[in-house]
Amino acid sequence: MDATPNGKDAFVVTAANAAGDPLNWAAAAEALSGSHLDEVKRMVAEYRKPAVRLGGQTLTIAQVAATAAHDQGLKVELAESARACVKAISDWVMESMDKGTDSYGITTGFGATSHRRTKQGGALQKELIRFLNAGIFGNGTESNCTLPHTATRAAMLVRVNTLLQGYSGIRFEILEAITKLLNNNITPCLPLRGTITASGDLVPLSYIAGLLTGRPNSKAVGPSGEILNAKEAFELANIGSEFFELQPKEGLALVNGTAVGSGLASIVLFEANILAVLSEVISAIFAEVMQGKPEFTDHLTHKLKHHPGQIEAAAIMEHILDGSSYIKAAKKLHEIDPLQKPKQDRYALRTSPQWLGPQIEVIRFSTKSIEREINSVNDNPLISVSRNKALHGGNFQGTPIGVSMDNTRLAIASIGKLMFAQFSDLVNDYYNNGLPSNLTASRNPSLDYGFKGAEIAMASYCSELQYLANPVTSHVQSAEQHNQDVNSLGLISSRKTNEALEILKLMSSTFLVALCQAIDLRHLEENLKNTVKNVVSQVAKRTLTTGVNGELHPSRFCEKALLKVVEREYTFAYIDDPCSGTYPLMQKLRQVLVDYALANGENEKNLNTSIFQKIASFEEELKTLLPKEVEGARLAYENDQCAIPNKIKDCRSYPLYKFVREELGTSLLTGEKVISPGEECDKVFSAMCQGKIIDPLLECLGEWNGAPLPIC
């Protein structure tokens, strides 16, 4: 309901109640229609708009995230149509006070002491702000106990939006003042801890009220990071020279809401939605470099499971893999000796849609829950003008925040667990289908341990992430003289989810660098294998085709079998010393010649037709030529003069690779270079924190029509 200027209440006509949906279930379900990817695209578009217009009911998490991050260049505007409504409720409070009406927080004490009474409404609000200023900032210590700048801006925006609906009893001028602080990039200092998000986020929100009322302990941070007192903040924001003298109910209206928890939750969920899509694309790239079998994305499999998150995750991966040069090449490899190879891929690859789907559903549902919360009226009491009464309820209870954030954090931890499993397979030469151990790229693997340190770091990240997955909401303590005996812990859960999100970014960054390393190693592998095949072919033709007198020799029939050895053998299993007798290449090439010799029968007794006699000359010439040609191929690779181009350029995953390699300036890591894995991962992490990964990520899916491929 919205209060109207003439003091009447009017139901807001929405799609929900117009369609006979008094319980709001249909509206909640409708909000989840369409694909998750389309929703993420809409979020990104909203995030990039230059202005946020507040009216009380249409605020989105993307707008909250944008306001939090864009402290310059983004303008917050208040709907002028809300002014009369807000004023009507404010006037009602003053009139009821004059009439002697007994209302909670207006004429009574607070919480467990609401049995106390007073007629000094303004003084009561002033005392409310004073006793709620119970936070600790730890000034001058190494511990930073101040709420992050972004979270405070988010809280300010959300609180203004909820108060605009006109049920709380506050002057429109106070909302304008908060908006001016936002638009002039002046951020009150709020304590990091001290709220249980039960009667709202009382303690942190009291510091916004403290700044507005000019409390001497209130501080703000200015546009250049300077510390401001209340007077300086007002002057810089062009609010005026006079602080607000709170009228009855206004202090309670400012502090008795869930804006800090839901504001931070909005920031978290905006990024969580993007990282969820990234995890889908990363899983597809993982399948490419691991030479996976793409049938794990077949729509029939997922259609039969019914879960929309799983179906969409599989369809996105299917889209990335459809037409992939890696998948085409892998198919040919799988056709070689198929009975000697695993029939299906390991779980981290094959069940990635089933694993990610529920996490995406949880994140998406949490997004809608928080979006409802930031558009809700969530203080107490609420004023119903038409009924001429203050309604005493509990909308300040931030349970939707605590539950949504606990669930989101568990989903984030599950995404991280999958990434770690995939990363572990990628760096393990027992499982990665021919890539070198630890993704080493040097000529001498004994002096290059590649991503070994990165895998240890990933284990650390994953362990901390799993710990953070534990629920916050199960640790409720009875508070405020047992009045707040159940409380949501919404902000605490939001903070912990924000920590989890940071760790998932660390994991995503590290994994992306490793995947780009694997892509480059596949490119190097292809060129090295091609070089080895050419050399083996040349040497075979020169040494095995003819006998000593120029006649055709029986060993000439060995060439095709020799080339099959090169095709079958993992290149990195021998390439650091290709002619070593302890490595498989030379052993298996010799075995081919020996097998042909054994089948040569009586011809072996004749020196002119003996294949055994050819083995020494074949190996001697190979040992002379092969190391030089392999080094030449490596040099050509290092100088971007490869005979075979990189397959990634023909894949839908190329935009992400291009972003990491070209825009961020990362390169193939080797023990021969000074640069460390952490330096490259840092570049990706920083770019991710700045939102730069969004465009290349969405470009990978630019051609997807929102549907799986037809079942053939």
From Swiss-Prot:
Keyword Plastid: yes or no? Answer: no
Task: Name the protein family.
Answer: Belongs to the PAL/histidase family.
Q: What is this protein called?
A: Phenylalanine ammonia-lyase class 2
Q: Where would you say this protein principally sits, based on its record?
A: cytoplasm
- What is the annotated localization of this protein? Cytoplasm
Gene Ontology MF, one: phenylalanine ammonia-lyase activity
Question: What keywords are annotated for this sequence in UniProt?
Answer: Cytoplasm, Lyase, Phenylalanine catabolism, Phenylpropanoid metabolism
Q: Where is this cross-link: 5-imidazolinone (Ala-Gly)?
A: A198-G200
Reaction(s) catalyzed by this protein? L-phenylalanine = (E)-cinnamate + NH4(+)
Residue spans crossing the bilayer: none
Q: Name one Pfam family in it.
A: Lyase_aromatic
Instruction: Tell me the function of this protein.
Output: This is a key enzyme of plant metabolism catalyzing the first reaction in the biosynthesis from L-phenylalanine of a wide variety of natural products based on the phenylpropane skeleton.
Could you say which EC number(s) this protein's record lists?
4.3.1.24
Q: How is it modified after translation?
A: Contains an active site 4-methylidene-imidazol-5-one (MIO), which is formed autocatalytically by cyclization and dehydration of residues Ala-Ser-Gly.
Give the residues annotated as active site.
Answer: Y104
GO BP, sorted A to Z: cinnamic acid biosynthetic process; L-phenylalanine catabolic process
* GO cellular-component term (any): cytoplasm
Pathway it works in? Phenylpropanoid metabolism; trans-cinnamate biosynthesis; trans-cinnamate from L-phenylalanine: step 1/1
Where does the record place the modification 2,3-didehydroalanine (Ser)?
S199
Work out whether the entry's keyword set contains Coiled coil.
no
Which Gene3D superfamilies does the record cross-reference, listed alphabetically?
Answer: Fumarase/aspartase (Central domain) (1.20.200.10), Fumarase/aspartase (N-terminal domain) (1.10.275.10), Phenylalanine ammonia-lyase 1, domain 3 (1.10.274.20)
Binding-site residues, (E)-cinnamate: N256, Q344, R350, N380, K452, E480, N483
